[in-house]
Curated annotation (Swiss-Prot):
Protein name, as recorded: Thrombospondin type 1 domain-containing protein
Disruption phenotype: Conditional knockout results in reduction in the area of lytic plaques due to inability of the parasites to invade the host cells. Loss of rhoptries discharge. No significant effects on parasite replication, stimulated egress and attachment to host cells. No significant effects on morphology and localization of rhoptry and microneme structures. No significant effects on microneme secretion.
SUPFAM superfamilies tied to this protein: TSP-1 type 1 repeat
Principal subcellular localization: membrane
Species annotation: Toxoplasma gondii
A Pfam family assignment: TSP_1
Compositional bias segments (type: Basic and acidic residues): 201-210
Region named Disordered: 82-101, 189-240, 298-383, 445-471, 1129-1153
TM ranges: 886-906
SMART domains per UniProt: TSP1
């Protein structure tokens, strides 16, 4: 027997004349010895001897038609000379190990099969027999040489069709019957010769050991022949090749069938692992074209394809797996068979990892990181129990839906191309791909002369075709055909370059699992947890002992919690205890939380303690009043919520942070029975005492001591995913355009680390929030809405070393597959300058980030070399930048204001000098008139009346000139002010003016009313003779008349440049109107935000009141009364200065006639007459769109609105009912 350490052996099966040697490796006994083979076969077959084995290097054994190729020859290096061709007899004999065994010598069969020479000590046969055996041996060697030559010739001709030892499949199928018949004939002749020279005593044994050997053709029509067995005679005990297994005719057939099955199984494994067959390549080609057809079908109707994908996710996974198989086989074209086996193993492992990642797409985001789900109470730190309510959209936004789906540029194409021309263009394109695919398949098996000649011929034909096309016409295709060819090219390019990435992205994002499952299958739950009731929130008489429950008192409808209820959900109430005792800590006086039957939770010890104190109700009442909290639960809970969400990622990239989860109350009314009465209230109100969000501690590792001092900038990835947007060295997306020259010119950028991003958060956080709001479709700009969004973890911001930040505020890491899928055109990433190298200390609480926007923009422009020198003053905040033409307006306004202020101050301080100057000018004019009259008196008395009249005429002329000058100054000042206001009016003021004028048709009536009021005022002044008399009655009134009215008007106009042409410069303010203005200034920013509907309502009421007063004749009497009262007040002031009592004038009748007008002055106090408060033009238009009418009614409406707003702003925050 051979030693058990031999790894390669061949089992000899003697089947009456045919020697079929099966290598032990072909029956999966690669590491077993011969004894183990015998034991395995002896268990199922009849006993037989297994003592002779032939080395696998024997050419007869390896070249037998029943023996498959050795596994070592198939996986050997292609550079070795024996990798694909049969070895000769001499080389096989030289390399064969010595065939030696205890007491067994070599015989002539080993010489024939293994090519070994006869050694000394062996028995010699008669010379005639040796000659015949030598002749047969030469014939067999010639047959082997012929087989090798045919195999080499067929390998050179068929290039890529070779299978076993250089013999092609086609040649093997054609030559197999002839080779089998020739070998059987040679074996039979050899056995006949041996039988004639053998001893006679073994004929019965020969007949007993005879077997049936049958050969099958393709259709199973060949005959079965009975072959005479080989008799070995006395040499059977001395040989190793002829000693075989003892078989019966029944076991012989079953053994052959068993080994044939093992042989076919091994051949299939070898073909699949080592070298793909032609049929497998053709199936891959068909699958490639199937992907193109599926991409075109998706282009024609993307909705149906997405629906079918959602129905059967297994098909998409199978497609992605098959595409990865084809891509891996094409990539391994230049490798050897051993390397192809390793690549197949690696591709299979990558497919399994891809399938696992696609089946669990959000496993990284939903994992609890460093915290376990059942964390200890000290690790859990919750929020205060309030029901967070915000408006959520039912679906995703359009941008996020496009990001998650496999949308492409093919959707926007029109399907207007002709069907025939489109098919023709597609056939052309697919034939081109078929040629390239065929070249790839030929390259897998090696290049041959035929493939090279075919490639040269194809190149020559292509060049000739191009030259012929140039000679004919440059535009040979029609427009429709060009359009069809372009669409087919895009479809093929999509399937060729991005099919695998799209399939992977589809499997990753099409079944994105939200953090909170809001579907109908998620279910609803009734929240009935223990709530920490704080006695400090209730009156002093409420805390105490309840005899009915034998526990501390809970609010109505609530019961004390048992220890089991409290332990079940400690995270619902323990954070409240720790938050309350955060400053002073838990002590024995105030650190006890009462439970059912006076049991309590000890906050210092963090354990539940059973009560063993006295049972007296008075003592227990005192004990209950000293505690801070009582755990209570609802007797009948009406709080209906959804399920808890998954935990978010950690809130910080390093150090100690928090993870969050939440649940949402179900919207709808619920009923609860309280002492027989049914109370209807919403589920959100019922869930107010419970925690709707919880948090727990997490830690992703220690923070670095130092980081690079730099600034991270918000950038967008500009490199396509197919062009390699992922940077393997940085572990993130590529910053920049992807062009090295442009990136060097603009400034090389690299991704930021999480610590660098935290240090410069002020530079990019506003962009990140805006990106989250836009992607998630949130109208309400709230940080809580981002943190507790179900798809907030999908929108991400890329960082270095596979880090990313999502919209929930969580920091986590990609796996390599997710990172490559994330990096593409449009992805957001934080980048910094590559040249920054200074190191600064880092801490999560305090960072030395530069928050100055001017400095950041200046540094950015310097780094990108867009300007030579960036001035900080030139890049101020957007709110400080002036609009176009604003600089000139500002300078002119400043100059005009300065001049007006100087003139005003001079007139105010030098009032006496200015008055003296003006009086001297008037006196000089009067004296000149008197001189002229004196000279005229000397001419005669008859002209005396004329001289007196002349002096009076001169004085009247001077007075008229003064009045004319004052009126002219007023008109010019008003015109200048109006022109300045119109010139300096901004676009916003013009919009307000147009809006107010376009609200109603009242603006047209206002102009007519102003003209009427001006005419009525002039007529009222004519009817009041005291007005003209009072203007020139005192000398002190002259300078005030000349200077102060125009100067005051000009100063007011310069200060209030925003006043429009409808301002109140020609009308006076009443006391009620001034009080309304003061009230408006106090409440307008809080309570009154009137829209267009409110303004229309006020305008309507104002028009109705105006129409009623016009019918009663009110405006004329009201205006005349105001004009007379103004003159009376001026005369009263002058009388007080002169010591006069100042009796009533001629305007008493007008005052009495106007006593019925609304807003009369008699009922106003001195405080209401204060005119120090001034409104802007926009506020005046909002408050008084129709002038100064109905003031008291408007005040009443404003006060009512203020009270309503104050009442609605108060919301009860107490818990429970008394």
């Amino acid at each position: 027997m051979m030693p058990a350490t031999r790894r390669s052996a061949s089992v000899l099966v003697s089947a009456r004349g045919s020697a079929a040697r099966f290598p032990a490796s072909s029956v999966s006994f690669l590491h077993k010895g011969a004894a183990d083979v015998c034991r395995r076969f002896s268990a199922s077959l009849s006993p037989f001897s297994c003592s002779a084995f032939v080395s696998p290097s024997c050419p007869m054994a390896s070249s037998s038609p029943f023996s498959p190729p050795l596994f070592s020859s198939l996986v050997s290096s292609p550079s070795s000379p024996s990798a694909g061709f049969p070895r000769s007899a001499s080389s096989s004999a030289s390399s064969a190990p010595p065939c030696s065994s205890a007491g067994v010598s070599k015989v002539s069969c080993l010489k024939l099969s293994c090519g070994e020479r006869q050694q000394e000590g062996e028995p010699s046969l008669p010379r005639s027999a040796e000659e015949r055996k030598a002749t047969n041996r030469r014939e067999l060697e010639c047959l082997r040489a012929l087989q090798s030559a045919v195999a080499e010739r067929e390998a050179e001709a068929d290039g890529g069709w070779t299978t076993w030892r250089g013999v092609s499949q086609r040649t093997w199928k054609q030559k197999r019957p002839a080779l089998l018949s020739s070998r059987v004939t040679a074996a039979m002749s050899l056995e006949e010769e041996d039988s004639t020279s053998g001893p006679r005593g073994y004929e019965e044994e020969r007949e007993r050991r005879s077997g049936v050997c049958g050969e099958r053709g393709q259709n199973g029509g060949e005959k079965l022949g009975r072959v005479q067995g080989v008799s070995t005679g006395d040499s059977e005990s001395r040989t190793r090749c002829r000693r075989g297994l003892h078989f019966s005719p029944q076991t012989n057939r079953s053994f052959v069938v068993l080994l044939s099955c093992l042989l076919f199984f091994l051949v299939g494994e070898v073909q699949e692992v080592c070298l793909p067959s032609l049929q497998r390549m053709e199936s891959s080609t068909d699958f490639f074209f199937f992907k193109i057809a599926s991409a075109e079908a998706h282009t024609a109707n993307p909705g149906d394809s997405s629906k079918s994908r959602r129905r059967s996710p297994r098909s998409s996974r199978f497609t992605s797996k098959a595409s990865s198989d084809s891509s891996s086989s094409s990539r391994s074209s230049a490798d050897s068979s051993s390397s192809s086996r390793s690549s197949a193993d690696s591709s299979s492992s990558s497919r399994s990892s891809a399938d696992s990642s696609s089946s669990h797409p959000s496993s990284s985001s939903s994992s609890p990181l460093s915290s376990s789900p059942d964390s200890s109470p000290e690790e859990v730190n919750g929020l205060r129990g309030r029901a967070r309510v915000w408006t959520r959209r039912g679906g995703l936004s359009s941008r996020l839906r496009e990001f998650l789906s496999d949308a492409s540029a093919l959707r926007s194409q029109e399907s207007a191309a002709d069907a025939v021309e489109e098919a023709r263009a597609r056939v052309r394109l697919l034939s081109r791909f078929a040629r390239s695919r065929r070249q790839t398949l030929e390259a897998l098996g090696g290049k041959s002369r035929r493939s090279e000649w075919r490639r040269k011929r194809t190149g020559m034909m292509a060049s000739e075709a191009r030259e012929s096309h140039r000679g004919r016409d440059l535009n040979t295709l029609a427009d429709r055909e060009k359009k069809a060819l372009k669409s087919a090219l895009l479809a093929a390019q999509l399937s060729r370059r991005r099919m695998q990435s799209i399939q992977s992205e589809r499997s990753l994002y099409s079944l994105v699992r939200p953090l909170l499952d809001e579907s109908d299958a998620a279910g609803v739950y009734t929240a009935n947890e223990c709530v920490a009731v704080r006695y400090a929130d209730y009156p002093k008489e409420f805390p105490g002992y309840d005899i009915s429950t034998e526990s501390c008192r809970c609010p109505d409808g609530w019961l004390p919690c048992a220890e089991s209820d409290a332990v079940a959900r400690m995270s619902a109430w323990e954070p409240v205890i720790w938050e309350e005792n955060a400053d002073e800590g838990c002590t024995s006086e105030r650190g006890e939380v009462m439970l059912e039957h006076m049991n309590f939770y000890s906050c210092p010890q963090r354990t539940f303690v059973e009560y063993t104190g006295p049972r007296d109700a008075t003592i227990r009442d005192k004990q209950c009043k000293r505690v801070a909290f009582v755990l209570c639960r609802a007797a009948t809970s009406s709080c209906i919520t959804g399920p808890w969400s998954e935990w978010t990622s950690c809130s910080v990239p390093c150090g100690e942070g928090y993870q969050y989860r939440w649940r949402i109350p179900v919207t709808g009314a619920s009923s609860s029975t309280d002492k027989g009465a049914v109370t209807q209230r919403s589920s959100r109100e019922a869930c107010a005492p419970y925690h709707m969000e919880e948090r727990r501690k997490c830690n992703l590792g220690a923070c670095p001591e130092k980081i690079t001092k730099t600034t991270c900038f918000w950038t967008t990835v500009q490199v396509d995913r197919a062009e390699g947007a992922f940077d393997e060295d940085q572990g993130s997306c590529k910053c920049g355009t992807g062009d090295d020259a442009i990136d060097r010119e603009e400034g090389a950028m690299v991704p930021c680390t999480p610590e660098e991003a935290v240090a410069s958060m002020d530079n990019w956080k506003s962009h990140f929030r805006q990106h989250c709001y836009t992607s998630l479709g949130l109208r309400r700009r709230s940080n809580l809405a981002l943190r507790f969004h179900s798809y907030g973890h999908v929108v991400r911001l890329g960082l270095r070393d596979l880090w990313h930040l999502d919209c929930t505020g969580g920091w986590s890491k990609f796996n390599i597959f997710e990172a490559k899928m994330f990096c593409g055109v449009g992805a957001k990433i934080l980048c910094r300058s590559r040249t920054d190298s200074a190191q600064v200390p880092f801490s999560m609480e305090q960072h030395n980030a530069e928050s100055d926007a001017v400095t950041r923009i200046s540094m950015l422009l310097k780094r990108q070399r867009r300007v030579e020198e960036a001035s900080p003053q030139a890049f101020a905040e957007e709110s400080l930048l002036l609009s176009e033409g604003g600089v000139s307006h500002l300078w002119i306004s400043l100059c005009a204001g300065a001049v007006a202020a100087v003139v005003f101050l001079v007139c105010l301080t030098k009032r006496a000098a200015v008055g003296t100057f003006l009086r001297s000018r008037v006196s000089t004019a009067t004296a000149g008139g008197e001189t002229v009259s004196a000279k005229g008196s000397t001419r005669g008395s008859r002209n005396a009346g004329r001289r007196v009249f002349s002096a009076q005429a001169v004085r009247e002329a001077v007075e008229e000139r003064v009045h004319a000058f004052v009126a002219f100054a007023r008109r010019q000042t008003t015109a200048v002010i109006l022109a300045t206001e119109k010139w300096m009016e901004t676009a916003a003021e013009r919009e307000v003016t147009q809006e107010m004028q376009g609200v109603s048709t009242a603006s047209l009536r206002l102009l007519e009313r102003d003209c009427k009021e001006r005419e009525e005022r002039d007529s009222a002044r004519k009817s009041c003779p005291q007005e003209a008399k009072g203007l020139l009655e005192g000398e002190e009134d002259v300078p005030a008349l000349l200077v102060f009215p125009a100067l005051k008007t000009a100063t007011d106009r310069v200060v209030r440049v925003a006043r429009s042409t409808l301002s109140l410069e020609t009308r006076s303010f009443s006391g009620a109107q001034r009080s309304a203005q003061r009230l408006w200034g106090k409440v307008r920013s809080i309570f009154l935000a009137r829209g267009k509907e409110k303004r229309d309502e006020d305008l309507f009421y104002g028009e109705e009141g105006e129409r009623g007063r016009i019918q009663r004749g009110g405006p004329a009497a009201f205006v005349s009364s105001l004009a007379c009262q103004k003159v009376e007040r001026r005369r009263a002031r002058r009388g007080r200065r002169e010591g006069d009592s100042g009796e009533g004038g001629d305007c008493g009748e007008a005052r009495k006639a106007n006593s019925g007008v609304a807003g009369r002055l008699d009922s106003l106090t001195e405080m209401e007459r204060d005119d120090s408060f001034v409104l802007s033009a926009v506020e005046e238009k909002l408050l008084f769109p129709r002038g100064k009418r109905n003031t008291q009614e408007k005040l009443a409406r404003i006060n009512k609105a203020a009270r309503t707003a104050a009442v609605s702003a108060v919301t009860p925050e107490s818990f429970g009912s008394m």
